[in-house]
A protein has these predicted regions:
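Core Rossmann-like FAD-binding/catalytic domain of the broad FAD-dependent monooxygenase superfamily
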Residues: 1-191
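Helical substrate-recognition/capping region of FAD-dependent monooxygenase/halogenase enzymes
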Residues: 79, 147-280
Length: 280
């Protein structure tokens, strides 16, 4: 669909082949880390991801000259898993060879067509933001589509989808590339890109265009998600649109009626819960 619409991809030039191996832990006495681990081994870079229950995943970087058929063979997989466990300790459930890319579509909307997820962007997996970014796309878009369909907003609202999502996800792709280059640099015995890979000097992505109101220093920044006694604050907000205020904030009935028309909920908080939001 993207090609049919003539939308080009901006390529950041970071492509690598990896093989993913999903396993089931058969030996409960096998000593494996409970933490996600990135092995910057000069012989081969490996990612280890402990999953739910007995699920364990390894991801192995291709070396120069290795083929997809070779890397997906049961014999090679057993060899790759050897440092962590034997076939009678780890049951191989799935083998997948893939090549990741670092690309972002130039446009996220053409007429009534909107790009989301992999159609609009792809990134290296090192920061775990691929699926998260796709979910942000959809969360950003669905309420706007619903508002336009219900007659609560003009269709121009939909143009904000590109404005808000493209810059944000382009920054996520760039950060993932920096993280990947850091991993490669450490494996090669250097760490020139250490600061960039860890996000040093990088401002957390926020909205500079799109739907913005007011000139407060935090306008457009992601909303904080503090932990409360009974769980995360996002659970208290629930689904849909929330108007978060302090209990002392005076909002006219007319304004509240307009919020209610789009099924928004008002959530009152203590001023000390978000001091940075209400301090000035």
């Amino acid at each position: 669909m993207r090609r049919q619409l003539g939308i080009e991809l901006e390529n950041q030039g970071f492509d690598e082949d990896w093989v993913v191996v999903d396993t089931t832990l058969l030996d409960p006495d096998l000593s494996l880390s409970s933490l996600v681990t990135q092995y910057c081994d000069p012989d081969r870079i490996v990612t280890y991801i402990p999953g739910h229950g007995t699920h364990r995943r390894w991801e192995f970087q291709f070396l120069e000259g290795e083929t997809r058929a070779e890397m997906a063979s049961p014999e090679r997989i057993a060899e790759l898993l050897g440092p962590w466990g034997s076939p009678d300790q780890l049951q191989v459930d799935r083998i997948a060879v893939y090549r990741f890319h670092a690309v972002v579509a130039e446009r996220f909307r053409v007429g009534d067509v909107f790009l989301a997820g992999d159609a609009g962007h792809q990134m290296p997996p090192f920061n775990g933001q691929g699926m998260c970014s796709g979910m942000r796309d959809v969360e950003n878009l669905i309420w706007k589509l619903a508002a336009v369909a219900a007659g609560h907003a003009d269709e121009r609202l939909l143009d904000s989808y590109h404005d808000e999502r493209r810059r944000h996800v382009a920054g996520q792709v760039e950060h993932a590339v920096d993280a990947g280059r850091l991993i490669n640099a450490i494996a090669e015995g250097g760490a020139d890109s250490f600061e960039a890979g860890y996000g040093g000097g990088r401002e957390f992505p926020h909205l500079e265009t799109g739907l913005r109101c007011g000139n407060h220093r935090l306008t457009g920044h992601p909303f904080p998600q503090p932990l409360l006694e009974d769980g995360g604050f996002d659970r208290q907000l629930g689904d849909g649109i929330a108007l978060v205020t302090t209990a002392s904030t005076d909002i006219s009935a007319d304004v509240m009626d307009r919020w209610a028309a789009i099924d928004a909920r008002r959530v009152d908080t203590r001023a000390d819960l978000f001091p940075n939001l209400v301090g000035d």
